[in-house]
Amino acid sequence: MKSELHIGYLIFISVVAALGGFLFGYDTAVISGTIKDVSTLFSLDAMQQGWYVGCALIGSIAGVSVAGVLRDRLGRKPVLILSAVLFTASAAGCAVCADFNQLVIYRIIGGVGIGMVSIVSPLYISEMAVPRYRGRLVSLYQLAVTVGFLGAYLVNFQLLEYAVAHAGENTDSTFGLLFIGQSWRGMLGMETVPALLFLIIAFFVPESPKWLIVERGRREKAVSILQRIYSDRREAEAQADCTASVLSDNASSSISMIFRPGIFKAVVCGVCIAILGQFMGVNAVLYYGPSIFEDAGLSQGDSLFYQVMVGLMNTLTTVLALVIIDKVGRKQLVYWGVSGMIVSLLLIAAYFLWGNTLGVSSLWLLFFFLAYVFCCAVSICAVVFVLLSEMYPARVRGLAMSIAGLALWIGTYLIGQLTPWMLSTLTPAGTFLVFAAMCVPYIYIMYRHIPETTGRSLEEIERHWTGGKC
């Protein structure tokens, strides 16, 4: 008879780790409401504006680069705490910075936190969760990211409304400066609230049992933590033994292990799905949606409203993905979702080619974008962090996830920099045709090379690669 699961405890530690995803989303999206005021205050030219937006991504690349090493040496929990410290320092520093250079430095610090948490949070959740619930629990991270996006949009809107309503009042006080005179400081500074919450409660989650066994050989400590999840000690010991048995053929962890045939294939596949996902258009839509809608002839107000609808669809669909990911399966979601993305992207391109000429309502463009975001959020956005946290052998998981995460952030940075150029040079229609074309190799790699991980233990998934089953 199987022991009873303490699902409430699993949810608690998953939510704590997923709070890092909320900070990821907030830190990424809040910048959109501050660009105009920051540019005016510090007299930024176009290149400096681009640097202001992109500097955090440079920090994210640095954070990803060191996250794997730090979490394998220090543990998953200390890196979560460190990322919370970085988020807090970044938000507070941005709120009180004296000049543009200081602002950039604090944004880079926050970016390092983003990079770390984007790797550590989903991995930590996957290592704590049982196979039955792992997909849904890891998807909490992606849900938290989308909620962070919405949270930033709402904070930006409310603080701007407050600043306008109280214009002319005394701004000599700190409160007046942050929320009236220079409300962009308040937008960035409000992140300190969830960051401090994350910092405090991160101390109350346990270390990953798998890390304790893999890196420290502390089986008894791992069993005691597993007993908080499994009510029966025998079941906890069985889980610990299962983890240890997978490691029996690997005496040590080293970079050279990455180049073993089965493991190297897993790493290459992870890099491919990480970077290709960024060139299928999702971040271009989330970052530059209002500009794209304005290119279609909409007013600034209508463009912002349409972007809010896109954000709401992203969040609501992520909730749906959270419910069905362990029932439908990772690969099935990708097949159907990416196929829908291709159709939606082709329809968006067609609208930009012929929509205005034929007098097609802009509501159809909104519908096509919502369909695209739905298909994307229910498939690649929901699946990528789950797969990257599941698919690697235990002894190289930290390094392999860092490599994939680095590829993801490089792709994010490139698409963020290239999208304005693509829209002006290739036209919006050509840009979305390129995004549609990039979906094809993604489906091929998923079909041909990635194993289905739904309902399988991390140890079973590891045997897929090391056993040479391709």
Predicted regions: what is each one?
Residues R233-L247:
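Short, well-structured alpha-helical segments
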Residues R219, Q227-D232:
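TPR/TPR-like (Sel1-like) alpha-helical repeat modules
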Residues K221-A222, C242:
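N-terminal juxtamembrane cytosolic/stromal segments of multi-pass membrane proteins
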Residues M1-R218, I225, S248-C470:
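Alpha-helical transmembrane bundle of multi-pass membrane proteins
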